[in-house]
C-alpha cells in the first residue's frame, strides 16, 4: 500500500511540476491582467465586475491597446475556449470586422446560447443564413415607407403618452426614471415597426405587459448562459431548473404573442417589417415558416429596443452635467423650428418634430454621437477565431479562441481620440464651420453601430428616433438629477444604468433668450 501511495505521490509531483513549467511559459506570454493557476484572470474579472468596462480600458491602456489572457488555465483548453484576445486598436477592429470578416463569426458558443431566443435570426447567424436575411432587411431599411412608419410610431408615442407622463410628473413634483420610460417607448416603437402591434408599455400607469415581461426574462436568462459553461446550462435545461426553467416558460409567452401577431399580419398586411418578410421566399421558393418569422421579428425587437433607450439615458446624464451643451442644443432647436413653424413658440411643442426637421439638427446629432463614443450601447463584442491569424499590430490569435474588441475603451484612449478623450465635446463631430456632421476619417475608431458587413441597418432610423425623443423632452422641460441618485453601469451586454436615471423635471418656459 505504501508503495502505491509513493507511486501516486510521485505521479502527482511530476504532474504538478510539468503544469508549473507549462504555466510559467504560458503566463510569460500573456500581457494582460495577472493570471493564477487554473482560474487564470477570472478572480480579477469578478472582483472588478462593478466597473468591468473601465477595468478593461485600464488594462488596454497599460498594454498599448491589445492584451491576451486566460480564464481557464488548463492544458489543451487554455489555447482555445479559455483564451481571450482583447483589443481596442482601430486597425485590429477593422481587420476583425472587415478585412478577415469570414474568419471572425459569432461562433458556436454564442449561437448555442442565443438559439432558443433568437434562432437563426440575423443577429445570431453567420454565413449564408445571415447573408439572406441581411440582403432582405437591407432592401427594406432603404425604403421611405419604413422611415415614414417609424416617424408615425415615434411621434404618436411621444405626443399621446410620453408628454402626458412627464406633464403629470411636473404637476405632482414627482421624479421619473428616464431610463425606464425610454425602454418602454423604444419597446413600443420597435414592436409597432416590426409587427404592427403596440404593447403599450408606455402608459400613464406604467403597466407590466406580459409580452414585455416575458421578453425581458428570456433575454436575461439567455445572457446567463454566457456566464456559465455550455455543459452547466445544458444540464439545467435538461432538468428544467434555475434560469433555464424561466427561459422555457417565458419563451412560451413570447411565442404565443408572436403567433398572434403573425396571424394578424397574414390576414391584414401593413407597412411593418413582418408584413414585408411574409412576402419573402427562401432559396427554394417556399414561404418562410412561422417559427422562422418569429425569430426574425424577435431579432429586430432585441436590436431596436435597448440600444436607443440606453443611448438616450446616457445622453441626458451627460447633458445634465454639461449645461453649455444643453444650451447649444436648445438654441439649434429654436433656429430650426423658427424656420419650419414660425415665431409662435407654442406651436413648437404642439407636435413632436417630423423626421425632416430632425434631419436638420446637426449639433444634436453630434451630441448623440459623442454620447455613443463615451457610452456605447453595446460596450464590447466577441468573435470566434476560425483559423490562426495575426492582427495588424502583430498579435497572434489561435484558432478556437475568442477575440473581444472593446468599443467602450476605443472612445477613452488618448492615442485614438486625443488628450481630451474623456471630455464630452460634441464639436469634435462637426466641420470647422460647425455646419455639418463629420464622421472620423478612420471609420473604425467609432464602431458604436458596428462596422463592415454587419454595420447596423437601422443607424439612420436610430439617430432620428433619438433626436425626436431628445428634442421632445428638451423643448418642454429642464431636467435635473434626483439628489443622491447614483448612476452606475450594470454588468450586461448592453450598457444599462444599474439604478436607472431618476430625475426631476421643470417646465422650460421661453426657449429663445
Curated annotation (Swiss-Prot):
CDD domains: CYP86A. Keywords: Heme, Iron, Membrane, Metal-binding, Monooxygenase, NADP, Oxidoreductase, Transmembrane, Transmembrane helix. Induction: By abscisic acid (ABA), the ethylene precursor ACC, mannitol or cold treatment. Down-regulated by auxin and salicylic acid (SA). Its EC number is 1.14.14.80. Catalyzes the omega-hydroxylation of various fatty acids (FA). Acts on saturated and unsaturated fatty acids with chain lengths from C12 to C18 but not on hexadecane. It catalyses: an omega-methyl-long-chain fatty acid + reduced [NADPH--hemoprotein reductase] + O2 = an omega-hydroxy-long-chain fatty acid + oxidized [NADPH--hemoprotein reductase] + H2O + H(+). It comes from Arabidopsis thaliana (Mouse-ear cress). SUPFAM superfamilies: Cytochrome P450. The keyword Iron applies. It is found in: Membrane. The chain crosses the membrane at residues 7-27. GO terms for molecular function: alkane 1-monooxygenase activity; heme binding; iron ion binding; long-chain fatty acid omega-hydroxylase activity. The keyword NAD does not apply. Its cofactor is heme. Belongs to the cytochrome P450 family. Expressed in roots. One of its GO terms (cellular component) is plant-type vacuole. Heme binds at residue 456. It is a single-pass membrane protein. Pfam families: p450. This is Cytochrome P450 86A1. One of its GO terms (biological process) is suberin biosynthetic process. It comes from the Eukaryota.
